[in-house]
Amino acid sequence: MSDWFEHFGYGEVAEGLVIGAYPQDVVDVAALSQVSITRIFNLVQDAEYDDGARAAVVAALEDAGIDEQRLELIDYGGLLPGQIELAVNTAMDWLHDGERVYLHCRAGWQRSATVAAGIVALREDIEPERALELIRERKPTAKPLAHQRRDLLRWWTMRKQKR
């Protein structure tokens, strides 16, 4: 297992939804396979990977039969409402279909926690701030930056207004 993946790890934050660090090699992907991950939603940019790591992960995912979708978001950056909506809806569809979903950013602390809070808020019919609290109970390192929390609340408000 890569040092990064071992250090930052992952955790199940809701039924069927696991968030964490980005896998960097075949051993990291094998660890995800061992916990029955069937789909990955990747929020990492190509530039965040070490040389050759992205290609190794793609090959390992294919070999493991794990499907991946990506939405490259800037590390430490903001999340637009449309980006949150896409990631949340995709993961929600997968979860509804019985998939076990791994949602990751680089360390599993910020971008992935923000999107996971949107998923938990919708699934549990709770406010996003409460969803973040639940996620932190299950994965204490999950802590979106202040501007990412604001992005989540902006998305939530816009979504509610459309109903």
State each model region's role:
Residues 1-102, 107, 115-163:
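Cys-dependent protein tyrosine phosphatase-like superfamily
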